[in-house]
Amino acid sequence: AFYHRLWWPDLVLIKRDAFRFHLPTKHHLIERLSAGELPQWFPYDALGRPFIGGTHTGVFHPFTALYVLLPVPDAYRASTLISCLLGALGAFALGRMLNLSRAGALLAGIAFALAGHAVSMTDNIVYLYSLCALPLFCLGIEKTLRNRIAWAALPAVVWATVFLIGDVQTGYYYTFIALAWCWARAPGPWLNTGLRLMLIGCLAALLAGIQLGPAWAVFASSDRTQPALFHEQALHWSTHPLRVATVLASPVGEYKDLPDIGRFFFGNPQRPWSVWAESLYLGVPVAGLAFLGAWQRRDLRVLALLGTLALVLALGRYGGLYDVFYQVMPLWSAFRYPEKLMGVVSFALAMLAGAGLDSLRTGWFRPAAWIAAATVCACAWLGLHTDTAGVWAAAEFGAPAPLARSVTESAAWAFLFSAVAALGVGLAVFGARHERLRGAWPVAIIVAIATLDL
């Protein structure tokens, strides 16, 4: 229901790259294809640049068929909607594969598709699709490890489509996700697991070769081959530590002047967009259930590992580890925007939240923890709601007084909403301790609270 407007005809996505970049390039693509030729050159950007080799044009991705059949704005909306549905259904299917209950898998799908990071990516189909394909990719790897080797085609095709739509960076990250998944969940000998993973990688490379070849030619002639020159640009849009708090409490001035908020509070001085993802929100209910899931389901610790590692890397210049990878890992220095890795954090937390919900269903009741979280959030609301908080923020961050007051006020309301959500979950958990209230109702209430909170 959240994405219902994507179903409406004659609407155009106009936010950021959707309108300024993707719609014009798709128009050019369809014009060239209609003329019976592949668009080798894009003359409308500076003095011109390669079109296919630019990767993010997504010439060979299956979504291109939508642009042939529909008007460009409608095709873009349809591809955005399909990506969101793919993410939700993929997370649900992966949850069932990981032995989550239907309710747990449902919560995982909802939390992943409605997470702030995923919603923020609706302005860029390249980044949105590669994020939403991640659950299906992990599902394919799990099936390949546990069933016939023919299942290797599924993760290979998903992986290839990530390259074909143009997100080579996330496709590169998929390599590390696949390695971690196989290391943690391989049921058989390491040799057999390694061969299956190599098969997946080779198939993906063959399928995506038509895009990776031109992309490599463009990359080889760019300044991205020189890490020392590209270092500052690569670390731009690192996730500021203050932004991590918005995973639990949001919005924090998100609907005010985003460039000024990014400039004064999150260390990004460049305009017009000083934050990469407009929201990183998941909420206290999802985060709390994710912690419980990681604690109770030891077989899913790979998700906790992936989420933690991705979070530290997403900090970029503030975390230090990204710089190490930049210097050590092959090709890592070719990519930018560390905050992209927050999508992996959202994925891991969403899946673990489903496992945490199942822990409540099996009798692991700790309502006091939820009441304590609600109390902490309520105290934060009381503290940030004062004029003193606005004065302190203006002095500490050098922000104009009206902006500082606006941010602290919105943060206060965000913590109040989080307190209410945490209290609601705590009451549902408390009720589930009693025989008369056990069953589907407490679980349904918790899922509803988490959904409404998102």
Question: Predicted segment positions?
Answer:
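Hydrophobic alpha-helical transmembrane segments
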Residues: G54-F60, D74-L89, W276-F291, V345-A353, ...
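Active-site lumenal/periplasmic loops and adjacent helix-entry segments of GT-C-fold
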Residues: H4-L98, A103-A133, L242-A277
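Hydrophobic, membrane-inserted alpha-helices
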Residues: H61-T64, A88, F112-G116, P135-L136, ...
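Contiguous transmembrane helix-bundle modules in multi-pass membrane proteins
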Residues: I125-V126, S130-C132, T144-A160, V168-T170, ...
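Transmembrane helix interruption/hinge and helix-loop junction motifs
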Residues: L70-D74, N147-R148, I165-Q169, W295-D299, ...
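Periplasmic/ER-lumenal interhelical loops and adjacent helix-loop junctions
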Residues: R16, R20-L33, E37, G201-G293, ...
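Membrane-embedded helix bundles of polyisoprenyl
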Residues: L85-L98, R102-A186, R196-A215, I449
